[in-house]
Amino acid sequence: MAAKKDLLTQLRGKSDDDLDAYVHENKKALFALRAENLLQNKVVKVHMFSTHKKNIARALTVKQERKGKVHG
């Protein structure tokens, strides 16, 4: 739980451009995981799918909070 709060404080400290880069990096990693999964690679860490998705959602939530849109 503390790791999530630390990540949120780090994300809130970043600029919008840094948040966009963070989202892009996580989307690239998610795409790479999907590609490895399609190739039926046995070393794919399945838990990383949800980790990257949640990181993307957290970063986008921080961006929305800055715009004043908390819920949608």
UniProtKB/Swiss-Prot annotation:
CC annotations in GO: cytosolic large ribosomal subunit
Keyword Plastid: no
Pfam families listed in its UniProt record: Ribosomal_L29 (PF00831)
Annotated Gene3D superfamilies: 1.10.287.310
Intrachain disulfide bonds: none
MF annotations from Gene Ontology: structural constituent of ribosome
GO biological process, any: translation
UniProt keyword terms in alphabetical order: Ribonucleoprotein, Ribosomal protein
Sequence similarity: Belongs to the universal ribosomal protein uL29 family.
This protein's name: Large ribosomal subunit protein uL29
Gene source species: Chlamydia pneumoniae (Chlamydophila pneumoniae)
Taxon lineage: Bacteria, Pseudomonadati, Chlamydiota, Chlamydiia, Chlamydiales
